[in-house]
Each structure stands twice: as structure tokens, then as C-alpha cells.
Amino acid sequence: MKVAIYPGSFDPITNGHLDIIERASKMCDHLIVSVIHNPNKNPLFSLEERKLLIEECIGKYANVTVDCFSGLLMEYAKGKEATAIIKGLRAISDFEYELQMALMNQRLCPSIETVFLMTSTEYSFLSSSLIKEVAKFGGSIHGMVPANVYKAITNRF
């Protein structure tokens, strides 16, 4: 069985993330959306809240599950017997950072490939940080995030 991991902070998940999930789910037998716990960040939503928000969005994908982790991605991936890491790219600036990470990950675990997926054009401007900033100042994020996330963010701000 081909297992792929789509890691991220997903604080919050956006329609761009869901675009990558939908497309990546067609490329593997099992896709694990892995919510990263980063102790150096101060997230809007807790790890468990982010996991639940994502689970509410992925019900139509029988081969997609959600998990949480902290630590080295490649150690986590080996434990899940993954063969690929999925990374979404919006722009060249994403590629520069993600290429460096992919090369390090390849060095740590040569048997696991990194697969880059370009975000669909209509989502290429979206980022979780931008969503939070717009919402914080009262701007509309309608159509940029799933309905459950829209409700959670508007309740938070």
C-alpha cells in the first residue's frame, strides 16, 4: 500500500490545502494529513481543534485520515511506512524553501520521496497567515476557507 503524508500546521486549513488533499488522494492508497505541533509558534487553533476542523472537511475521501505529530517529519514518516511526502507550492518563494527541506529529508531518509504539487491558480494567493490577518481586521474570508473553518474563525475574532 502506498502511503503519502501531507504535513502542515493548517492553522487554519484553507481551500488551497483542500485542493492539494483532493489531488494527492488520487495519487496514493492512503493519504495522511499530518498536523504539525510546533512549540515555537502560537497558533490560533489548538492542535486538536485543527485536527477536528480538517476531519470535518475530508469525509468524502475514503483514503484520507488526519493525524498529529511533533518532531522530525522523516522519523514520523518512517513510522507510518510512508513512501512520499506531499508539499503544496504557491510560488517560487515556496519552492526555494521546500526544495531545501526536501533535500534534507532525502538525506535523512532516501527511500521517501517528496512530491511537489502546484496549488490551483484560484488558490495561489491563499495562506493561513493571510486568512488570519484578514479575518482579524474584519475582512471577508468567505470562499477562501471551508464553511466550518469560516464559522470557527469568525467566532474566534
Swiss-Prot record:
Q: Which UniProt keywords apply?
A: ATP-binding, Coenzyme A biosynthesis, Cytoplasm, Magnesium, Nucleotide-binding, Nucleotidyltransferase, Transferase
Binding locations of substrate: S9, K41, L73, K87
Principal location class: cytoplasm
EC code? 2.7.7.3
Main EC class the enzyme belongs to: transferase
**Cofactor(s) named in the record:** Mg(2+)
Identify its protein family.
Answer: Belongs to the bacterial CoaD family.
**Protein's name in the database:** Phosphopantetheine adenylyltransferase
